[in-house]
């Protein structure tokens, strides 16, 4: 049986964590990005399908390729973030299932149903994006996830000729708390949950 993490860890991962819009000029190392992936890859996905693929944009040249896809409200915070992760999903993720899920012929579940494959890839890559956010927080980083961008432009600029499609963007770095907005409310248990 697992032990509960400390109250301090819960604060870091959830209750005190914020979505950041401003960033300190502290770089995020390639080693840290590798450490992030080494943590988040263990989060569960359906049949261990692991459809998410990540592009970590760290250079000015990479940010300029991304710029035309960004909405005006997401432009400045993305250009100044040390890292922007493109979270994509592989439309042919099932080709890795003989390696990732060798217990049966899971590949055929998806090759026989393109709709199931797309739904599975999108849903599970979204879950993996959440694991990446939690891994960032666990390593002392801050994040700013965004869906306000032109997906087709990102796909054309970064994934042309591939089986990858963009899902969302996540800015990653060390946040500038002076640029945080007031904390917004969340739905109560009664508003969001049911008990049967």
Swiss-Prot record:
Gene3D superfamilies: NADH Oxidase. InterPro entries: Nitroreductase (IPR029479), Nitroreductase-like (IPR000415), Nitroreductase_HadB/RutE (IPR050461), RutE-like (IPR023936). Keywords: Flavoprotein, FMN, NAD, NADP, Oxidoreductase. It catalyses: 3-hydroxypropanoate + NADP(+) = 3-oxopropanoate + NADPH + H(+). Induction: Up-regulated by the nitrogen regulatory protein C (NtrC also called GlnG) and repressed by RutR. Its EC number is 1.1.1.298. GO terms for molecular function: 3-hydroxypropionate dehydrogenase (NADP+) activity. The keyword NAD applies. May reduce toxic product malonic semialdehyde to 3-hydroxypropionic acid, which is excreted. This is Probable malonic semialdehyde reductase RutE. It comes from Escherichia coli (strain SMS-3-5 / SECEC).
């Amino acid at each position: 049986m697992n032990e509960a993490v400390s109250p301090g860890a819960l604060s870091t991962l959830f209750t005190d964590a914020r979505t950041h819009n401003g960033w300190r000029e502290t770089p995020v190392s390639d080693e840290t990005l590798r450490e992030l992936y080494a943590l988040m890859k263990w989060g569960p996905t359906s049949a261990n399908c692991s459809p998410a693929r990540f592009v970590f944009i760290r250079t000015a040249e990479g940010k300029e390729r991304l710029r035309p896809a960004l909405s005006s409200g997401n432009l400045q915070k993305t250009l100044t973030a040390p890292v922007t992760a493109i979270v994509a999903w592989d439309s042919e993720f099932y080709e890795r299932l003989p390696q990732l899920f060798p217990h049966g012929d899971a590949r055929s579940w998806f090759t026989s149903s393109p709709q199931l494959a797309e739904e599975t890839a999108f849903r599970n890559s979204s879950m993996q994006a959440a694991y990446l956010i939690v891994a960032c927080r666990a390593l002392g980083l801050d994040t700013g996830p965004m869906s306000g961008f032109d997906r087709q432009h990102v796909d054309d600029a970064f994934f042309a000729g591939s089986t990858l499609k963009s899902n969302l963007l996540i800015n990653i770095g060390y946040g500038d708390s002076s640029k945080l907005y007031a904390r917004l409310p969340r739905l109560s248990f009664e508003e969001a949950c049911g008990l049967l």
